[in-house]
């Protein structure tokens, strides 16, 4: 019942937000404050030229972290790192004790120019981190053990060109899609000119299956899948993945060599025309692809694709209702609205305007479903 948050100055904080009776505190209490970048530099023996981007706990309570940003150019050769803070040290600090971080922070040095571009995932097998160049499965074993490292392909940073209906671009240089896990597979997209959904074997890191996605859009649109995909494993051999196009959101300023794409402000990472004109400046595309277990391995097939929707909310699936929940803009009326899609067919089953006025762009804030429904 504590809040764990990375900060823009490379620290990680653990905060107490409620008292012993569950009442929200008027001012959160800071229980832990670690300068991760400084600790990682000490462990690495080098200066890091990337900032802290993401953190996640693994199943043993170790806190994994990765440096990077929303667009990491390999040719700039900035030094980055992935690593973890040992569970025992975190517990000691929370008990009010001193912890020697030189014996509790472990790192894996990345090739200069390599860095994370989104979130980290964790399972009982370890922590999965997707950088702009590779996908890793890592384990904490008194140091960072690289169980496997699988490279993937990217066309590099994508930007709008002549004839495009957008002015922005993609956010990431590489895949940009936070990996999503099943017990047996790691799911993410690459960033080739035709984007592919990849399924990696959790045990070996080998590509078990792949399939092109969002490859039949109207003229004038490119593809960049920048958010964590929805992944649903039905437990009977079928894994369904929902991918959503995000091309057009990225600011042209991300190409500036002096830009720090780890700073997550609207002005820094998002296209000004999307911020001011709305979803007409975002490329459409939402697609469901199923990965099916066969006698010989896995095969993928497209189930449905919506080339008329531009979603900005990071779609959410409710397995209880069988609906996908999103937030879009009606491009005819200009009104922002909630939208519900049928998981099986992709058809729209419900929309509701949030207002009768303009200006309700949710600016990429994710959808959340409470346990009350």
Task: Map each language-model feature to its residues.
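Conserved beta-propeller blade signature
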Residues: 2-6, 62-66, 126-130, 185-189, ...
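Short loop/turn segments that connect beta-strands within beta-propeller blades
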Residues: 17-20, 85-91, 139-143, 201-205, ...
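Loop/turn-rich, solvent-exposed surfaces of beta-rich toroidal or solenoidal domains
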Residues: 185-189, 195, 227-358
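Surface-exposed loop and turn segments in beta-propeller and other repeat-based domains
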Residues: 29-47, 96-113, 147-171, 210-222, ...
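Asp-box/WD-like beta-propeller blade repeats and closely related beta-sheet repeat scaffolds
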Residues: 8-60, 66-121, 158-166
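Short glycine/acidic-enriched loop and turn motifs that connect beta-strands
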Residues: 3, 9-13, 69-74, 134-136, ...
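Repeated scaffold domains used in trafficking and secretory/extracellular systems
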Residues: 1, 39-56, 112-123, 173-178, ...
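Long, internal scaffold/assembly segments composed of regular secondary structure
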Residues: 120-234
